[in-house]
Structures are given as structure tokens and as C-alpha cells.
């Protein structure tokens, strides 16, 4: 129903943001890391959304880019992990660390996320290892889109020892966040490179 909402970031709480668009102020629930990524109050933002609808409530969940939304939706496929729990997990681990832990079956890293014990971590690995939407999409696209625009950065990060598929996913995410904040990634490659290193580390 909603793919994204663009407007002025009019407020923040500990677990949500308010975005004003055409006289309507939307409350959108986000992870702690997304709260920081979306920038400061008063700026124009674009938030990718997912609508949670039950008989007794409707909630909008938001993400700074489409890749994080895909990861969130993957997490909600795990038995016992609902939307609020998925956001908590994404508040404790950045998407790169989370995807890497799921792909490598790293129980210890997954258990660092809020509310994730050994059993939940095992369920997450069983449900999602080798099945993450973002990494599968990178493979199916043949890495073409990133190769065209950001190949120098991808190559540099890969040579530093980071896994290429994870690098591509992160570079795409951060480039999209920069565009949403009004910054051109191609003109600010140093920032894109620096933020990618932080996200991958």
C-alpha cells in the first residue's frame, strides 16, 4: 500500500520518527540505527515503509533504504520474530553484521542483539542462511548496477578483505541514504567510502 513517505522530519522519539507531508504527520516506527541514519529534525527525508495491519491496530515501520526493509521482512519470516522484535534486532546489529552472522551461522554475534537467545538465533540461521533477499538479489543482478557507478569503492573495500557481496549491499544502501539526504555519492566518494568501512566493520 505504501512504498515510501517523503517529507520533513518533524520529530523523533526513542523508537519512532514523525514525517510531515502535505499537512499530515506520520508516525513511523524505526530501529535505533535507522533513527540516526535518517538525520536531524527539520530536514527533508525519504523513509521506506511497511504497513502492519491487524484488527486492533495499524503501524507503519520505516527504513532508510529498501535493503534494510528487505532484511526486516526476512527477519519477520522467522518463527517467533514479529515486527517489533525484528526492529530490536536491527537496533542491536547493523545490517552488514547481521547478514554476515546469518550467512556464517554465527550464533555468538546473533545473541548480541536485544532479545535474542540461543534458540532464537538457531531459528534465525535455520530460516535465513542462504536465503537472504538482499544477497540473493545481488547475485541475480550480476552485480551490474554497483559495478557501473561505485566499482572503484567496491574494489578498494574488497581488497581490504571484506566479502564482495556484503560490500556491494552496503555501498548500495549508503549511496541510497546519501541521495535521500540530498548528497550525491559520486561527488562525495570519500564519505561513501568512509561510511561503508564503518558499516562493514
Curated annotation (Swiss-Prot):
Gene3D superfamilies linked to this entry: 5' to 3' exonuclease, C-terminal subdomain, Nucleic acid-binding proteins
UniProt record, GO biological process: DNA recombination; DNA repair
Cell location: Cytoplasm
GO MF annotation list: ATP binding; four-way junction DNA binding; four-way junction helicase activity
Positions of the UniProt region annotated as Domain I: 1-64
Superkingdom as given in the UniProt entry: Bacteria
Pfam families, alphabetized: HHH_5, RuvA_N
UniProt keyword DNA repair, yes or no: yes
Matching InterPro entries: DNA_helicase_Holl-junc_RuvA_I (IPR013849), Hlx-hairpin-Hlx_DNA-bd_motif (IPR003583), NA-bd_OB-fold (IPR012340), RuvA (IPR000085), RuvA_2-like (IPR010994)
Protein's job: The RuvA-RuvB-RuvC complex processes Holliday junction (HJ) DNA during genetic recombination and DNA repair, while the RuvA-RuvB complex plays an important role in the rescue of blocked DNA replication forks via replication fork reversal (RFR). RuvA specifically binds to HJ cruciform DNA, conferring on it an open structure. The RuvB hexamer acts as an ATP-dependent pump, pulling dsDNA into and through the RuvAB complex. HJ branch migration allows RuvC to scan DNA until it finds its consensus sequence, where it cleaves and resolves the cruciform DNA.
Quaternary structure, from the entry: Homotetramer. Forms an RuvA(8)-RuvB(12)-Holliday junction (HJ) complex. HJ DNA is sandwiched between 2 RuvA tetramers; dsDNA enters through RuvA and exits via RuvB. An RuvB hexamer assembles on each DNA strand where it exits the tetramer. Each RuvB hexamer is contacted by two RuvA subunits (via domain III) on 2 adjacent RuvB subunits; this complex drives branch migration. In the full resolvosome a probable DNA-RuvA(4)-RuvB(12)-RuvC(2) complex forms which resolves the HJ.
Protein name as it appears in the record: Holliday junction branch migration complex subunit RuvA
Organism in which the protein naturally occurs: Treponema denticola (strain ATCC 35405 / DSM 14222 / CIP 103919 / JCM 8153 / KCTC 15104)
Gene of this entry: ruvA
Amino acid at each position: 500500500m505504501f512504498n515510501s513517505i517523503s517529507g520533513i522530519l518533524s520529530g523523533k522519539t526513542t523508537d519512532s520518527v514523525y514525517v510531515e507531508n502535505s499537512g499530515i504527520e506520520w508516525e513511523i516506527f524505526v530501529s535505533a540505527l535507522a533513527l540516526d541514519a535518517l538525520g536531524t529534525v527539520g530536514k527533508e527525508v525519504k523513509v521506506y515503509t511497511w504497513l502492519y495491519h491487524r484488527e486492533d491496530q495499524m503501524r507503519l515501520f520505516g527504513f532508510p533504504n529498501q535493503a534494510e526493509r528487505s532484511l526486516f521482512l526476512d527477519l519477520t519470516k522467522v518463527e517467533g520474530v514479529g515486527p517489533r522484535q525484528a526492529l530490536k534486532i536491527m537496533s542491536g546489529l547493523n545490517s552488514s553484521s547481521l547478514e554476515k552472522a546469518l550467512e556464517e551461522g554465527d550464533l555468538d554475534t546473533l545473541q548480541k542483539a536485544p532479545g535474542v537467545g540461543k534458540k532464537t538465533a538457531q531459528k534465525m540461521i535455520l530460516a535465513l542462511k542462504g536465503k537472504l533477499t538482499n544477497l540473493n538479489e545481488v547475485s541475480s543482478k550480476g552485480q551490474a548496477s554497483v559495478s557501473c557507478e561505485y566499482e572503484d569503492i567496491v574494489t578498494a573495500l574488497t581488497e581490504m578483505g571484506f566479502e564482495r557481496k556484503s560490500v556491494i549491499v552496503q555501498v548500495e544502501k549508503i549511496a541510497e541514504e546519501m541521495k535521500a539526504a540530498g548528497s550525491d555519492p559520486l561527488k562525495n566518494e570519500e564519505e561513501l567510502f568512509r561510511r561503508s568501512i564503518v558499516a562493514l566493520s
